[in-house]
């Protein structure tokens, strides 16, 4: 031990193998490789949009989601090799979870690694993401007892409030000086798409007031078949968020398709129910800070996630969650609604999220932990078309035992004993999914007025249609498996029974051979494992007369196999139908061919 003034500090003891600075360099190099590939995927998205390669865009979006874990595993393997034979290597190699505590020398070594890593981030453009990568690699090495700020970045070490790219993250236009029309044309042309515009002067017509300043993020936001310009108008001190949607027409030209105005329009664009954007960002913190000024209600954790930086979103969510726990006193309790057969769900009333644990014993044939986790990963990798809630997945989450309601703790002990560990004043959850809390649709319909019920039932049917068109069959379509968002959108959130449409066989019920068969509780026809009979849906879904009338007005065709068979055939042919996150009244030229069944 060394004393510096009156402060006692531990110097890492000399060990065989790499020094702490070497380890810090290795981890940062792993992150830099990851982020270079991340940016390259956004640059590829631009060329895919220009060429209209929508299947390539979907494939790229799926592949990018897995980049991070691949780079973390790669870096942890390199680190394990570098530390082989070193005193700093933990007792069981690349993982210390379940191993003995670190020695004093190992403790000093790993603390020094973090200190050296902080020094390397002084001029880095993605320091917050690099810190998260450091955490991910370290969590593969250290026991959870060391998951605190001495070893990990539980709190950020580098401030990003005023961090920006070498080339500023947004451009500014002054329509008072050069005219609104010219400013708008230049704003769009500056993105440098290598494909002609259909009629840019027409599209950029005088739709806006002229006495304003326009600030636009310097990169396009690509998702599926669309690209978006995101910015803000500042006029006499008031900020007006906006986004411009770009689409390719059948001739291969780019059109300005829609103008989205205000926080509700942009909140829908950046909804947690949609696929992540592909955006080229040198400095993601600058982009997120800009977006936060447009969407003050949306947590930065969600913004990072929607930009494809879902691990950084997880880090920020966890920090926000710990901060909320410190400044609240209510207890975790069983979530309201009908109990599920697969998940044990609880909530913290003061926090707008639910916590979902897979039950130890699942009372469904062919269903186990691995199957459920595969289904959730399937949703993570899939285009959620605005109809499936995104989730955050966590392991080894330590929560204060005093914050658990007694009935919840008893339920966890009974239903998920393998996923919890009670350790003194702490309850450790070994695996949990966290997602946005929504009003369950069954509860919403029970109390809704006739006009609101009509809208909700129409939304419910639209959700089923759009999921099917995106090659997702919900499986269990009961109302309890759907939720209603703040903006009244119906979203599916129970994934254990989802299947791909192309795996299903939609059939008509054959005529009964006789009256006895028709009255029997057993089917008189053979049923395969993936057979679905849409004629049966009404029996389970339409018991409420109000719901039945509304459903038949808007979605009667969903009760017959023909619609499902036609949809399955289109999906099997590889057709991509886009459901844009805006209504037709946001379109600049409503007379043009509308995007398929857009939704606000």
From Swiss-Prot:
Question: Per the UniProt entry, what species is this protein from, by scientific name?
Answer: Bordetella parapertussis (strain 12822 / ATCC BAA-587 / NCTC 13253)
Name the residues that bind ATP. 335-341, 356
Q: Choose one Gene Ontology CC annotation of this protein and give it.
A: cytoplasm
- Annotated localization: Cytoplasm
* Recorded coiled-coil stretches: none
Question: Which controlled-vocabulary keywords does the entry list?
Answer: ATP-binding, Cytoplasm, Glyoxylate bypass, Hydrolase, Kinase, Nucleotide-binding, Protein phosphatase, Serine/threonine-protein kinase, Transferase, Tricarboxylic acid cycle
Purpose: Bifunctional enzyme which can phosphorylate or dephosphorylate isocitrate dehydrogenase (IDH) on a specific serine residue. This is a regulatory mechanism which enables bacteria to bypass the Krebs cycle via the glyoxylate shunt in response to the source of carbon. When bacteria are grown on glucose, IDH is fully active and unphosphorylated, but when grown on acetate or ethanol, the activity of IDH declines drastically concomitant with its phosphorylation.
Active site per database record? 390
Q: Which Pfam families does the protein's record reference?
A: AceK_kinase (PF06315), AceK_regulatory (PF20423)
Protein name, please? Answer: Isocitrate dehydrogenase kinase/phosphatase
| One of the GO biological process terms | glucose metabolic process
Q: Which domain of life is it from?
A: Bacteria
Catalysis: reaction(s)? L-seryl-[isocitrate dehydrogenase] + ATP = O-phospho-L-seryl-[isocitrate dehydrogenase] + ADP + H(+)
Q: What is its main location?
A: cytoplasm
GO molecular function, a single term: [isocitrate dehydrogenase (NADP+)] kinase activity
What family is it from? Answer: Belongs to the AceK family.
- Please state the Enzyme Commission number of this protein: 2.7.11.5, 3.1.3.-
